[in-house]
Amino acid sequence: MDNYTWHSGTLIPSDSPSSIDRSQLYLEILGVLSVVYLLQTLVAYSKSFKAPFVGFRFWYEPKWLVGLRFSQGALAQVNEGYAKYKNAMFKVARNDSDILVIPNKYVEELRSLPDEKISAIRAHIKNLLGKYSTTLILLESDLHTRMLQTKLTPNLGSFIEVIESELLFAMDQEIPANLDDWQSVNVFHIVLRIVARISARVFLGVPACRNEEWLQTSIHYTENVFATVMLLRRFPKWMHPIVGHLLPSYWAIHRNLRTAKRIISPMVRQRRAEEAKRNPDYVKPNDLLQWMMDGANENDGQPDKLAHRQLLLSLASIHTTTMAAAHCFYDLCQHPEYFEPLREEINDVIAQDGGWKKTTLNKMRKLDSFLKESQRINPPSLLAFNRIVSEDLTLSDGTLLPKGTHFSMPSAAILQDNGVEPGADQFDGFRYYKKRLNPEEANKHQFAMTDNNNLHFGHGKYSCPGRFFASNEIKIIMAHLLTDYEFKYPRGATRPRNLTADENLYPDPSARLLMRRRVVAPPQASITPQLVSA
């Protein structure tokens, strides 16, 4: 029987000249695309820094296959590279980019270099596939990071009461009421909602921080960006314009942005209208949005652009803070011997201070140590200090990094190296507390601090500008939840395994803990004490 195919509404033999011509054309197109791809790869390789790749199982294995394995096996690949080339450079093949991993012996000479030489912003945008995640606005200015550094961080002490006030409101809204006995809860989700509320209170003020549509938008924007980036990385760059527009998460990002503009842009216009009246009784709101309005130039100060930057702040703050806090709760339940010492410290410090004061959190050294150890074991990323070389760069030892090189440092492997941290393979919640008992190191080893070994927040000029705010958020949340509630794993359960996506690590958001109200009330000296039911 003859074989037939459908062509222009007619069944024709599949071996007819028309079918053969089309097959030949498809093969020729495929051949041309393959040659173009090969040439692009060879040209890119010829311009790149020569360093050994890790992750290859055999020398002729296609790089895209190694990159595909990197998506779920990055930990093994980075650790392999660190073990083989601890004080040298090596490469990992991520599907969208080869990343040069360099040792932290270069930190000091790189940490203060300007964007004109190595760019943290361009690396950040590249990691987020800026064209598809609405993050290209970061190239226009550093407005929001500048306001975090110059306005929020220096005034964090004055926001302690604001944060605690919003926390108590959020706990009332987000924590189940029937917790007199053990109940199964999703702690990740509870903390996520609390962090979103507190962040909105500091970034936007009242009543915007209570706007449910904004809370949902600020939470889902990050999830949509992450989904879009992870999916697009599985495809070659030339397919991104096609695949990107087919992803539901891509269109959800743009819906999130439209919603942000609809909610925040009128707030900006209303505030400016009030300022224009020159009413002596008008008091400017004390929040990040107002600081951005006051510090913006004509371009940055457009209402829609301010709204856009507020959305980017949620991308940088809500989920990262939530993940760090969730890791802490998972680690506490795995190591329950730390519950009581932490509660004792929290209660003692608050009692000594007569409530929450500007310096209260600084005195909770055991809590700070536990956060830092939890992050050491469960880092947000295997790689940190991400940069793209803006122009050919010669390092102090003569090493030449060509323009366009994407490099980072193996931040997780460094802190899990016994040569850097003795006993690194063991969880020691008070590791850094004990180090600070030495008077010469009393002000070192803090959660939000960075140094040549501790790179999770970056280091130098482009360290995370919101890390001190995030640290305060987590500590206040944990202080209240630990003194008000008890937590444990369900019978037979242990700490959930961390999830991975390329170099990113994150706690299992579906994990459940048992939670119940404590029968001992927190100290009555608290500014707004939360009474605990018997």
Curated annotation (Swiss-Prot):
<feature type="transmembrane region" description="Helical">
    <location>
        <begin position="25"/>
        <end position="45"/>
    </location>
</feature>
<dbReference type="Pfam" id="PF00067">
    <property type="entry name" value="p450"/>
</dbReference>
<dbReference type="InterPro" id="IPR036396">
    <property type="entry name" value="Cyt_P450_sf"/>
</dbReference>
<dbReference type="GO" id="GO:0016020">
    <property type="term" value="C:membrane"/>
</dbReference>
<feature type="glycosylation site" description="N-linked (GlcNAc...) asparagine">
    <location>
        <position position="95"/>
    </location>
</feature>
<keyword id="KW-0408">Iron</keyword>
<feature type="glycosylation site" description="N-linked (GlcNAc...) asparagine">
    <location>
        <position position="3"/>
    </location>
</feature>
<protein>
    <recommendedName>
        <fullName>Cytochrome P450 monooxygenase AN1598</fullName>
        <ecNumber>1.-.-.-</ecNumber>
    </recommendedName>
</protein>
<dbReference type="GO" id="GO:0019748">
    <property type="term" value="P:secondary metabolic process"/>
</dbReference>
<keyword id="KW-0812">Transmembrane</keyword>
<dbReference type="GO" id="GO:0016705">
    <property type="term" value="F:oxidoreductase activity, acting on paired donors, with incorporation or reduction of molecular oxygen"/>
</dbReference>
<keyword id="KW-0503">Monooxygenase</keyword>
<keyword id="KW-0560">Oxidoreductase</keyword>
<dbReference type="GO" id="GO:0016114">
    <property type="term" value="P:terpenoid biosynthetic process"/>
</dbReference>
<dbReference type="GO" id="GO:0005506">
    <property type="term" value="F:iron ion binding"/>
</dbReference>
<feature type="binding site" description="axial binding residue">
    <location>
        <position position="464"/>
    </location>
    <ligand>
        <name>heme</name>
    </ligand>
</feature>
<comment type="pathway">
    <text>Secondary metabolite biosynthesis; terpenoid biosynthesis.</text>
</comment>
<keyword id="KW-0472">Membrane</keyword>
<feature type="glycosylation site" description="N-linked (GlcNAc...) asparagine">
    <location>
        <position position="498"/>
    </location>
</feature>
<comment type="function">
    <text>Bifunctional terpene synthase; part of the gene cluster that mediates the biosynthesis of the diterpene ent-pimara-8(14),15-diene (PD). Within the cluster, the HMG-CoA reductase AN1593 functions in the mevalonate pathway, which produces isoprenoid precursors. The geranylgeranyl pyrophosphate (GGPP) synthase AN1592 is needed in the formation of GGPP, the precursor for diterpenes. Lastly, the pimaradiene synthase pbcA performs the 2 cyclization steps that convert GGPP to ent-pimara-8(14),15-diene.</text>
</comment>
<dbReference type="InterPro" id="IPR002403">
    <property type="entry name" value="Cyt_P450_E_grp-IV"/>
</dbReference>
<comment type="similarity">
    <text>Belongs to the cytochrome P450 family.</text>
</comment>
<dbReference type="GO" id="GO:0004497">
    <property type="term" value="F:monooxygenase activity"/>
</dbReference>
<keyword id="KW-0349">Heme</keyword>
<dbReference type="GO" id="GO:0020037">
    <property type="term" value="F:heme binding"/>
</dbReference>
<keyword id="KW-0325">Glycoprotein</keyword>
<dbReference type="InterPro" id="IPR001128">
    <property type="entry name" value="Cyt_P450"/>
</dbReference>
<keyword id="KW-1133">Transmembrane helix</keyword>
<keyword id="KW-0479">Metal-binding</keyword>
